[in-house]
Each structure stands twice: as C-alpha cells, then as structure tokens.
C-alpha cells in the first residue's frame, strides 16, 4: 500500500457537499410518481396482458408454469410469443424550460420528453424499438444497458463497435431483443454524453421476486442535471475538473434550491402494504446515496440479478446501477423525506443542490412537506455493497488465480498531452471509427483490428475468464470508476481494502495477501460495479455469448477520454450467429452514415463513444 499526497482537488474542483439531509425551500409543489410514469409512457404500446399466473402478493416467487425465482434465467426463458413494440422519435428543442424553472439552450428528447418511454415487458417477451433520428447534426445509437443480447450482438447499440450511428435528419433502424432476464434497467444513447441531453429512458421487465410485496410502484430514476449541454461539458472536462451538477432530478423532476421553482417527486404509500420500488442511477457523473427517513429498504434485485432479501438503511448507487427494493409502509401515516446524498468527499461527484429529495406520502395523511429531516446515512465512500447474494447461484474457484499480463487491465490517467485528461486501459485509450465498427471486420473476415479499438480478444469457449482491473499505483491521483460490461453479468470476486475514497491510498494486487480477500462462493453478480480509487477489482465472466462487448467506465467524461476496452468474444462463433437480416440492416445503416458523415459540420474529437460538438474554450467559465 502507498499513500500519496492528495492531488484530488484538481479533479474535484470544490469542497464536497456534506452528507446532509433535506432542508429544502418551503414549497409544497409535488408531482406524483404515477403521473410522471404515465407521461413517459406516451409513444409506447400498453403492455399486453399475459395469461393468469401464480404470481400474487403473497407468492411473488412463482411466475408461470415451470418458471419461478429459482429458474436459471440464463438457461430457460418463458416462450410468451409476445412482442412489445415502441417508436422513439429523437428531436432537438432550443430554449427548453426545465423542470426546475431554468431554460436550457438545447435538449435532445425522445417523443418530446426529458426521459423516453418506460419500456415495459414480461419475462420472455420480445422488445422491438424503432428509433427515428430527427436530430440536426448528431448521429445516435441506443444501448440497452444490462440486456445480455444473447445472439443479438448487433442490437447492443454501441456505435463504432456493433453498428454505425443512425444518421440525423430522418435516419432510422429497429432494435429487437428478447427479455431473457427480468428486473429493472435503462437505455441511453451511446453516441455520447448525448444521453445527458435527454436521450435516455427506463426498462421494466416483469418477473418473479425473492420477497412478497403488494404494490409495484414502478421505476424511480435519479440523475444529475446540468444547465449546460452535456456535449459541451464533455469538451470542458477534457482540460478541467468536472463541475458539480446544477441539480438532481428524481423521477424527472426537482426543486430549484435557489428559487424554489419546480416540484418534488411524490410517491404515495398505502398504509400497511409492501411496495416494490425500482431505483436507478441514470447519471452522467454523479453517484448517489439514498435513504428514506424512518424506514428501511429490503433489496430484492441488484442490477438485473434477483438476490436474497437484504434489509438496509441506505444504498449507494454507482452510475448505471439499479436496485429493486421493498418498502413496508408500517410507520405512522405522515410525509417522509427520501434523501439523496453524496459521499467520499466528492470523489464520485456532487451537486450544487445540497439537499436533493423526494416526498413519500402515506395515503390519508395530510399533505405538505415532511417535518423530520432524518439523520445522515453512513458514508459509503463511493463503494457498492458486496453483501448481496444472487438467488440463482454461480460459484468459481479463486484460490488458484494468478495475475498475468493477459488478464490484467491497468487503468491510468495520462496528463502529458492535449487534451489534458486522457484515460487509458491496457496502455491505450479507445478511439472507435464510427464508419467502420468492429462488426464490419467480423463480417469481412478482416482480423487487422486497429490498435485504437482497444480490443481484448477472448477465444475460450464456455469458460470462466478472470479479469483484474487496477488503478495506476503511480499516477498523480486516483479516482473511483463505475465499470460496466456489455453482454454479460460478471461475478465480483473481490476488491482492494475499503478506505476513504479521497485518501489517495494505493493498493496493488498481492496474491500473498489478497487471495484471502476473494470470494468465489456465489459472490455478487451484476453488470456495473465500482473500481476503488487507488485500488483493484477482480471480476469473472463466462464466455457463453459471442460478441463485441464494451467494458468501460460509465462516467461520461471518462469514457469520452478513452476509458474502455472492447472484449471481442469468440469472433469466429460470432460471425456464424449474425443473421442475414441483421447483416443487411447493419450494412444499410453504415452506408447511410458514411454518406452523411462528410457533410457533418463538427469534427470527431473524442473516443467516439462520447460525441460532442466543438465549442471554443472561451465559451467556458470555470466555477
């Protein structure tokens, strides 16, 4: 272990907001969870009813004939024969009035909303989404975060990897994938920080659960919110510390801490009932700690993995993570603050709104603002819990793990060039070619992959592969990173010792000491987890899904700066699994993109996974 003098202030840029709880302006404005959900549903078809089921409030473990909470969903999926169809129309709006009363110069919306439709399906359904890109100059692609895309790699939505961007001014394509998993997730543009401008939405796949509940409240997304355009922010963060978010939207709404304009998200609880709430962090940079005053939450799913029930007082959500929780409305009928706080001394983000909050209202109680502000939750130090245990177990041996160059992915920050902040993994920063994605190489049999695509080829078939990710022990400073894998869930086998995120202590994996820290006996399994600041993380995934799968930091500015690799899993098998229909559609979109790109007025100036327009440095004032 090494301890470095902290240079973290260069990145944080300001004092961290304390782990404070709600002390909001006195306004009673509220917006109900159901109202917000119904507003976002416009543009999608209603969920088709399914056959009568054994899934009832007293027995959520059962689902349908032959399928329940113990079914291995990676092996068996209900055959519903149902397709849930949606149409997404992407548009740009200038001088848009935001939910907290501040006009934004430009936003990019799906079907006219700051969040797109909530995609709802049942376990086993097929989801079909036609995306029409009516943006002015930006291409787009839609990634279905956490969806494994078994045998549908070309529908993963990672431009420059699995497809060319959908060109603007009317370009379109249709994504199709099977809901082989169930739980809560989200979708977003992978053409950028573009999702920070509004090209984002939620996914709810109904299925069994590990704990009974009476009422499903649906999705509850939380996101950082900036008054400046996200693409401009990415340009700014190439050479400057990222600014704190201007506000935090909870289920699409917020109160402005300076003016009192806007509304609190309101969730109505039925006294005596158990409520399922699907909490998501759909941010570009902010990580959150959440808690409900005078209530506990019982976790039943982490990302899209059902877990054995685990009761907590608070939760940490990294960017991209989701938790399904059950809340028992057994307290005195009243109004309670749902608090969003920040930890780690701003090492994983902060907001200029010091008290983001929502209101949980017991039906029948008087209206108004809660009076009990609660107490600060424990500081999670920018680390997600390792205590969750999946219902469907996976176990692997760990005592024989050997660190080698071919299974180690070092993460380093390069401050030697222009732009100032360049993030490298395995010695290289990713920089994809929108007009020649990796799939193009697969289809043509060309194995001369560019170094800039940062490919890690994995040829093993149906084997557990182990990956050690290490933050640079010699770098000027070290930050935590929310690492997300496409195409798989991974096992979280272990990480370096839990220390304060801002301490700048450094740890390198030492088998003599750290093998004892590993857990291969049904460890946490998910698609996003935290690489500790100054530390290491050991993951494993099984090579059972041929494809080109990104593995990247989900902080928009970091992946824009190169922090990603592309696992090319079993390329020969991948070629055989690409249908003629998918190949034809891939070529059509690429032909349209290649015809458009020479006319685009803005140059490509980043990794390609986070696209933004060029702005002059003089447009920016550092806070």
From Swiss-Prot:
Annotated residues for binding of Cu cation 3: 190, 486, 552
SUPFAM superfamilies, alphabetized: Cupredoxins
Propeptide residue interval(s): 23-50, 610-623
Keywords of the record: Copper, Disulfide bond, Glycoprotein, Lignin degradation, Metal-binding, Oxidoreductase, Signal
Tissue distribution of the protein: Secreted protein; extracellular space.
Entry annotated with the keyword Glycoprotein: yes
pH dependence remark: Optimum pH is 3.5 with 2,2'-azinobis-(3-ethylbenzthiazoline-6-sulphonate) as substrate, 5.0-7.5 with guiacol as substrate, and 6.0-7.0 with syringaldazine as substrate.
Its EC number(s): 1.10.3.2
Quaternary structure note: Monomer.
Name under which the protein is recorded: Laccase-1
Species assigned in the record: Melanocarpus albomyces
């Amino acid at each position: 272990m090494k301890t470095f003098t902290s240079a973290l202030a260069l990145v944080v840029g300001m004092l961290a907001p304390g782990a404070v709880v709600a002390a909001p302006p006195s306004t009673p404005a509220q917006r109900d969870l159901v109202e917000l959900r119904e507003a976002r549903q416009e543009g999608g078809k209603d969920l088709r009813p399914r056959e009568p089921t054994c899934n009832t409030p007293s027995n959520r473990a059962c689902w349908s004939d032959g399928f329940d909470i113990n079914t291995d969903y990676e092996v068996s999926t209900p055959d519903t024969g149902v397709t849930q169809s949606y149409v997404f129309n992407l548009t740009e709006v200038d001088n848009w009035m935001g939910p907290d009363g501040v006009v934004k110069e430009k936003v990019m919306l799906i079907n006219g909303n700051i969040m797109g439709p909530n995609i709802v399906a049942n376990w086993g359904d097929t989801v079909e989404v036609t995306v029409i890109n009516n943006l002015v100059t930006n291409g787009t692609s839609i990634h279905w975060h956490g969806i494994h895309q078994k045998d549908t790699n070309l529908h993963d939505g990672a431009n420059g990897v699995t497809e060319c961007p959908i060109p603007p001014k009317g370009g379109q394509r249709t994504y199709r994938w099977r809901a082989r998993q169930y739980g809560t997730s989200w979708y977003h543009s992978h053409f950028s920080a573009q999702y920070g401008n509004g090209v984002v939405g939620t996914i709810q796949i109904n299925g069994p659960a590990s704990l009974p509940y009476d009422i499903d409240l649906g999705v509850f997304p939380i996101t950082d919110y900036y008054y400046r355009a996200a693409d401009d922010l990415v340009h700014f963060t190439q050479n400057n510390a990222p600014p704190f978010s201007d506000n935090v939207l909870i289920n699409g709404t917020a109160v402005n801490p300076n003016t009192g304009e806007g509304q609190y998200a309101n969730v109505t609880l039925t006294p005596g009932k158990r409520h399922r709430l699907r909490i998501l962090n759909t941010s570009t940079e902010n990580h959150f700690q959440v808690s409900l005053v005078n209530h506990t939450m019982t976790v039943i799913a982490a990302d899209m993995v059902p877990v054995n029930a685990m009761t907590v007082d608070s939760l940490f959500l990294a960017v991209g993570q989701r938790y399904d929780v059950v809340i028992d409305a057994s307290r005195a009928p009243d109004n309670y603050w749902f608090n969003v706080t920040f930890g780690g001394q701003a090492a994983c983000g902060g907001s200029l709104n010091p008290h983001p909050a929502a209101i949980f209202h017991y039906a029948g109680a008087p209206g108004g603002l809660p009076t009990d502000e609660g107490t600060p939750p424990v500081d999670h130090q920018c680390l997600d819990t390792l205590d969750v245990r999946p219902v469907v177990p996976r176990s692997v041996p760990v005592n024989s793990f050997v660190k080698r160059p071919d299974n180690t992915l070092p993460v380093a920050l390069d401050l030697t060039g222009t732009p100032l902040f360049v993030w490298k993994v395995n010695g290289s920063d990713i920089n994809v070619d929108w007009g020649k994605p990796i799939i193009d190489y697969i289809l043509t049999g060309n194995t001369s992959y560019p170094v800039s695509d940062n490919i890690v080829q994995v040829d093993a078939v149906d084997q557990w592969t182990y990956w050690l990710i290490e933050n640079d022990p010699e770098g000027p400073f070290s930050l935590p990173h929310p690492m997300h894998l496409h195409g798989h869930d991974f096992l979280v086998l272990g990480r370096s010792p839990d220390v304060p995120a801002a301490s700048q202590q450094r740890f390198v994996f030492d088998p003599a000491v750290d093998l004892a820290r590993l857990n291969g006996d049904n460890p946490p399994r998910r698609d996003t987890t935290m690489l500790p600041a100054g530390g290491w993380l050991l993951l494993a995934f099984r090579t059972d899904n041929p494809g080109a799968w990104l593995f990247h930091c989900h902080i928009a500015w970091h992946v824009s700066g190169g922090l990603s690799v592309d696992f090319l899993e079993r390329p020969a098998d991948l070629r055989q699994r690409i249908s003629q229909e998918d190949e034809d559609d891939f070529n059509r979109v690429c032909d349209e993109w290649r015809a458009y790109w020479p006319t685009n007025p803005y140059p490509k100036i980043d990794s390609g996974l986070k696209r933004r327009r060029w702005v002059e440095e003089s447009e920016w004032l550092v806070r």
